[in-house]
């Protein structure tokens, strides 16, 4: 008798836990995506939305460039080995993990 009562109330809490777990995982992924998009948005003033510039043909597009190349260039700007009007200062504001994330994000964008 006690086992039947236990078996009756057990499924609803398990379902609730499963739903909460799935929601938490989705929320964490959404937060990660939002954080990455916010980080990439800092590039939009010059390089355009999603890395496709429209206003200044002298500014290179970032969409679709290889991640390895972007990492190398950002680190060169950061170290002062590559010069540009503002990129040397801007690159200093990113840590290596953020540079890697930005490079992967823009590499995944269609040209």
For every predicted segment, state its role.
Residues 2-14:
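Bacterial N-terminal signal peptides that target proteins for export
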Residues 17, 73, 82, 91-111:
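C-terminal capping alpha-helices of c-type cytochrome domains
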Residues 23-25:
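N-terminal signal peptide c-region/cleavage motif recognized by signal peptidases
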Residues 33-36, 51-79, 88-92:
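Gly/Gly-Pro-rich "capping" loops immediately C-terminal to redox-active cysteine motifs
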Residues 41-49, 102:
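The canonical Cys-X-X-Cys-His
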Residues 46-52, 107-108:
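Detector for the c-type heme attachment site
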């Amino acid at each position: 008798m006690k086992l039947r009562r236990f078996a009756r109330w057990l499924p609803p809490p398990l379902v609730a836990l499963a739903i909460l777990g799935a929601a938490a995982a989705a929320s964490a992924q959404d937060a990660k995506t939002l954080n990455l998009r916010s980080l990439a948005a800092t590039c939009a003033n010059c390089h355009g939305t999603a890395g496709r510039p429209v206003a200044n043909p002298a500014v290179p597009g970032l969409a679709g460039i290889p991640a390895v190349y972007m990492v190398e260039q950002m680190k060169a700007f950061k170290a002062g080995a590559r010069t540009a009007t503002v990129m040397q200062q801007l690159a200093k504001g990113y840590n290596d993990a953020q540079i890697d994330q930005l490079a992967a994000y823009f590499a995944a964008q269609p040209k």
